[in-house]
Structures are given as structure tokens and as C-alpha cells.
């Protein structure tokens, strides 16, 4: 018989993995629609590369800021995850309203910085739920990362 706590931890893992898939799907979303964006904004190949690389740069910046200020230790983890996911969505939406290259790059930087709040915080969150099956739980989250980042393609 499964104890209530075990049911809760698997529910938490399932919901967190789903959240990771949905938020991490924005990682390479610009790459999958690069042709349409380059036509809409009249961008060259170099500028499209900047849009793709801006997410990685934003992730590095976001991870440094998050760790420097120990955000996952200061804020309740559920709130931080929710905040990060909302920021990912809003930052990704910005690219729909951009009219120039600078706004598009800022949108992608903000997306990356927001993703840096979501993924590491989710790892910490799930590690607090699992003692015995922590390796399996971490593997599921890494799988969610992989599926999410590949989702746009």
C-alpha cells in the first residue's frame, strides 16, 4: 500500500516535470521559427544567431544572479518556481510584439534568465521530496528538460 506521503511526492514530481517540459520548450522556440522571424524583422543569419545565443547568455546571467542572492533559499520554492515560469511565458511573448532586433534580443535574454530560475529551483524542490528514489526523480527531471528543450523541433 502506498502511503499518502509517497503519493504526494510522485504527484509533486509529475507536476514539476510537466512544468519543466512546458517552460523549457521556450528554450529553442526562436530557432524553430527563425525563418519567420527573419522575414518579419528583416534579420540576417548573424542576427538570428544572436537571438538563439541570447537565451544561453540570459541563462548564465540568471543563474549567477539567482545563486549570488540565494533566491531558492530566501523565497518559498513553490513561489519561486511559479514566478520563474510566469516570467518565462511573459518574456517569450515579448517577441510577438517586437518591432526591432534589440527588443527581440532583450526578450530572449529575459527568457534565458527566467529559465535559470525554473530549472535549478525545480531540481532543488524535487530533491527535498525524495530520499530513497532521488536518483530516479532527478533523472525524470533531466528527461523533462530534454523533452522540453526539444519540443519546438
Regions found by a protein language model. Give the residues of each.
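Conserved MFS/SLC helix-loop-helix module at the cytosolic interface between two early adjacent transmembrane helices
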Residues: 63-102
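Small-residue-rich segments within alpha-helical transmembrane domains of MFS-like 12-TM solute carriers
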Residues: 24, 28, 112-120, 150
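Cytoplasmic helix-loop-helix junction between adjacent transmembrane helices
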Residues: 107-144
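Residue-level signature of mid-helix packing/kink "hotspots" within the transmembrane helices
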Residues: 28, 55-64, 149-150
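Helical-face signature of the major facilitator-like transporter fold
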Residues: 16-24, 92, 100-112
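Small-residue-rich transmembrane alpha-helices and their cytosolic helix-loop interfaces
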Residues: 20, 52, 56, 85, ...
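Extracytoplasmic
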Residues: 11-45, 62-66
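Juxtamembrane helix-start elements in MFS-like secondary transporters
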Residues: 44-52, 77
Amino acid at each position: 500500500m502506498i502511503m499518502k506521503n509517497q503519493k504526494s511526492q510522485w504527484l509533486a514530481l509529475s507536476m514539476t516535470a510537466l512544468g519543466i517540459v512546458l517552460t523549457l520548450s521556450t528554450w529553442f522556440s526562436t530557432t524553430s521559427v527563425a525563418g519567420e522571424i527573419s522575414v518579419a524583422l528583416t534579420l540576417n543569419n548573424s542576427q538570428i544567431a544572436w537571438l538563439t545565443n541570447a537565451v544561453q547568455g540570459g541563462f548564465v546571467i540568471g543563474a549567477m544572479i539567482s545563486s549570488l542572492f540565494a533566491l531558492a533559499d530566501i523565497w518559498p520554492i513553490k513561489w519561486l518556481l511559479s514566478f520563474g515560469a510566469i516570467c518565462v511565458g511573459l518574456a517569450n511573448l515579448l517577441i510577438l510584439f517586437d518591432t526591432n532586433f534589440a527588443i527581440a534580443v532583450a526578450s530572449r535574454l529575459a527568457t534565458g534568465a527566467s529559465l535559470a530560475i525554473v530549472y535549478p529551483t525545480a531540481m532543488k524542490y524535487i530533491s527535498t521530496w525524495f530520499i530513497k528514489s532521488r536518483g530516479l526523480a532527478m533523472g525524470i527531471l533531466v528527461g523533462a528538460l530534454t523533452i522540453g528543450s526539444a519540443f519546438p523541433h
